[in-house]
Each structure stands twice: as C-alpha cells, then as structure tokens.
Amino acid sequence: PGANRQPFFFTTPKQRNNKVVLRYQERFVAKLLEHSLAYGHVLYCMDNETSGEEAWGAYWAEFVRERAAERGRKVHLTEMWDDWDLRADRHRRTFDHPERYDFVDVSQNNQNKGQEHWDNFLFVREYLSSRPRPMNTTKTYGADRNKFGHTDQDGIERFWRHLLAGAASMRFHRPDSGLGINDKGVAAIRAARMLESLIPLWSVEPANELLGERGDDEAYLAAAPGTAYAMYFPAGGEVTLDLASVNGTFDLRWIDIATGEWGPTAELTGGAKRKITPPTDGNW
C-alpha cells in the first residue's frame, strides 16, 4: 500500500476489524503458506515498499509465524517500508522489534547516492548494534535511463558500498530499475566473489577512519586491521591507508569490477601511511 488509501489494508483487528474481508485474506495467505512452508529457505516480507499502518504488517507477521509453528518451521520475517530516509520514524517499526522481525530490508537506501548512501547504512548498522540482525538490500536500484534518473554507475556503486558496509545480501533490481543480470551486473557479482575468495567479508568491518587525504565518495574501506583491508574506488582517485601501527608485508591485489577480472598486484609494507592509487579511473 504505497499511498495506503485502500480499505483492503485496514482489515485487521487493531485497525478497522473488517471481518468480512479479513476472512478471505487469511484464506489466501494460508493457501500460499501451504506451498511455501514446505521449503526451509524462504524469507517472508509482509509488504513491498509500504506506507501501511504498523498494525497491518504486525498482524500478518504473527499470522505467518503461527502457521509456520504449526508445521514445525522456523521462519524469518521482515517488513519493507517505502521511506527513502532510513532515519525516518517509520523504519523504527522494524528496527525496534527484533521479536517480530528477524532481519531488516533497507532497499530504499538505494535511492540515495554517494557518501549519504554509505552513511545511512552505517546509521542503521549502529542503531541495530545492541541486537544485530541481517541487513538486506533486495532492490539495488540504478540503471541508465530508469524512471528515477539513475545510471548504471549508480547501481554498481550502491552494490559495492553495501558490500563493504556489511549488508547480508545485495541484489541488482530488475531492469529497467536496476541492472538485473546484464553484463555489468554479472561482472560486479563475479568481482565480489573474487574478493570473497581473498577476504571473508564477515571478518571485516567498515573502517574509513583509516583512510587519509580522502574526498567524499572517493574511496571506501572495510578492514580487520593488521590482517586484511578491502577498499573500493568508484572512480579512480588516490588516498592513504594508515598502516603505521602494523608490521609486516601485505599483498595488494586489484580487481577490475568492470570486467570481473584480476588486475595488477603489488606489495605494501606496514609502519607508515601508504598511498593507494587504482590502476585506472573506474570501479576498482
């Protein structure tokens, strides 16, 4: 319910308690669950880009969980709000209820760009830190000539920022809102898997504070200091990486995100701040 004007979305007991319509809604959802609960890998989202009342999603979350329990299934639930501002009160309806929603979906952050996009995600990460939950971005928007005025580059940047910031999952949204699995999307995913072959991404955390001489949106870093550093450059540039308190030598390996292929290699030694410059402009 994007505009949330349709009575269909006000039927639950704590709303308008429309028992006539609710009976059919429950039968429909129960029929869907007859099929989906046969499988253990299904994630359940109560709505798509909703502006609905909190009671609407809460009712269906309880309904799904109860039916799952009857089948001996543990299910994982969330709600997807339409507000592009992740700091908005509406998102707290999910963030503040880990007993109801097992993970969060912050896809609407993908309407934002650059440093703001990164900072918003980290805000949610910190907000959830007392009771961490997976943060998914099921819809990565960004494709040339889409209805939002985005570009292909926007989609690639959003994917990689979320990857280094700690998202549990990222997916390029379907064309024309996103790249889908076109050549650029596939290359970016391949590059991410190549990075993962070197650095388990769950072993590093956002660490832009280790970067120096950095402009907004110039480079992004996730690190396990002294062990591994994963850096993303959206459009070339040059920054310093603070290795002053670190001993030893590190292998520097570049991945060309445009092609999903390995790039040049080098060595870095600890004990100082080291300049890092990607091989060319573009996504590295």
What residue spans do the PLM features occupy?
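Active-site mouth of glycoside hydrolases
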Residues: 1-100, 114
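Amphipathic alpha-helical segments in well-structured domains
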Residues: 29, 57, 61, 121, ...
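Proline-centered loop/turn at the N-terminus of a beta-strand
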Residues: 43, 74-76, 132-135, 168
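Active-site-proximal beta-strand/loop segments in catalytic clefts of secreted hydrolases
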Residues: 46-49, 80-83, 106-110, 138-142, ...
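Active-site clefts of carbohydrate-active enzymes
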Residues: 50, 88, 101-109, 118-153, ...
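Structural recognition of alpha->loop->beta junctions
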Residues: 93-104, 160-169
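Aromatic- and carboxylate-lined catalytic core of secreted/periplasmic carbohydrate-active enzymes
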Residues: 134, 142-146, 151-266, 275-284
